[in-house]
Amino acid sequence: MIKMQEHLENRFDFTGQRQRERQREGEKGMPKLEVELKRVVDDSYEIEIGHGLVDQVAADLKHGLAGKVHKFAIITDSNVEPLYARPLEQKLAEEGFQTDVFIFPAGEKSKTRQTKAMLEDAMLEKGYRRDCCILAVGGGVVTDLAGFVAGTYGRGVPFINYATSLLAAADASVGGKTAVDTPLATNLIGLINQPQKVYLDLDTWKTLPEREIYS
């Protein structure tokens, strides 16, 4: 037992700690090790506001917005898919990127753990691993779900928000808040995850229902 204890002390002889460990050993019977993790993280990102930003997204990705990633998962809902997700998919394909569109039924009712799991399984089936980037194309439900998926998929992959609603532009797509709802709580299961960039395409507002404009 004594030899094993000495072996552990020698192996984990971090700077200046061995003597303190021996003192603690005498007091409590076993040494304690302290792990210090100090880092500075810059989560800054750009918000671009304009008209018809699909070409700009493609240009930014070509210039390394998502690093060396060339595989993009476009997450969207059934309403936004034909309007904006498919044109973006086509543009990225023209630029040589590998893209797939992952769709869920539009509406707040889809903001669930079940939808998140469905999206993750669909990405796995398509061969997506850690070397990918997620593009959220849609309103608040889309950006919430896509950002949450990005934060956990492969222990974290980059993502970009392409907001197509006023709510997403003003709140959901910025600030890094991502979450899903459950029968017991709203927006309580989630995480803070900052995007690489946010695009606010004002042209997308032309297709919004009037009730959303005035609300």
Walk through the language-model features, giving the residues of each.
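Short, Lys/Arg-enriched N-terminal segments with co-localized hydrophobic residues
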Residues: 3, 17, 21-29
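Intrinsic-disorder-associated, low-complexity terminal segments enriched in Asp/Asn/His/Tyr and depleted
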Residues: 7-13
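ATP/NTP phosphate-donor binding region
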Residues: 29-133
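A glycine/threonine-rich phosphate-anchoring loop and its flanking beta-alpha core
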Residues: 40, 151-215
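Short beta-strand segments
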Residues: 75, 103, 136-138, 161, ...
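Glycine-rich nucleotide phosphate-binding loop and flanking beta-alpha elements
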Residues: 81-82, 141-143, 206
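Short glycine-/acidic-enriched loop or helix-start segments at secondary-structure transitions
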Residues: 84-86, 145-147, 171, 209
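A short, small-residue-rich loop immediately preceding and capping a beta-strand
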Residues: 127-149, 153-165
